[in-house]
Amino acid sequence: MDSKPYRYISKAINLDLYNELVSEIKPKRELMTVTYSDAKIPERRETAWQTETDISAEYSGKTMDPVPFTPTVHMLKKKIEEIIGVEFDSALIFHYIDGKDSMGYHYDTIGVGRGNHIAGVTFGSSRCLGVRNNETNEKEFFNLGNGDIFYMFDDCQKKYKHAILESKEENPGPRIAITFRQMGPNLSQKN
């Protein structure tokens, strides 16, 4: 059996932190540059960037300046490092307010290349994460619920794309996802 460079860990963190995280982080919806154009459109989700480094997060024509970890995000970083066995120094945070907030199939570039480890944890309502193989277009789907972790590693960003799909539920409720990443040069990892 061919092992895949991603892993789903159900109910890894048994805490209800959605309201606390949104209040503490204060994510915001910004304008993004449309690919192959100078047009700016509102992002389909709210975002925030927290890090122990002095590195900004940049994608789609926007730059997020480095902001230190808030207490709850720092506590979650430590818990995820224990579970995964990899150190992280940054977190790109996504707030999906309703079922229309989504993200199409893509591969990550922020924090990829240095360690290729991204561990995302979800709080709040469930959303469907799709993972698509770049060669075969085969898809796998995961219903990410409160406290679930989705961990991508090795060559995942080269071989697969992933998406948070638009919800078909009438009122799915909000969700926040904290994706821990490696930006700095001095982190350890089990491999």
Curated annotation (Swiss-Prot):
Domain of life from the UniProt record: Viruses
PROSITE patterns the UniProt entry points to: FE2OG_OXY
The name this protein goes by in its record: Uncharacterized protein R406
Species this protein is from: Acanthamoeba polyphaga mimivirus
An example Gene Ontology molecular-function term: dioxygenase activity
Cited Gene3D superfamilies: Alpha-ketoglutarate-dependent dioxygenase AlkB-like
GO biological process, one term: DNA alkylation repair
InterPro entries: AlkB-like, AlkB-like_sf, ALKBH3, Oxoglu/Fe-dep_dioxygenase_dom
Positions of the Fe2OG dioxygenase domain: 87-184
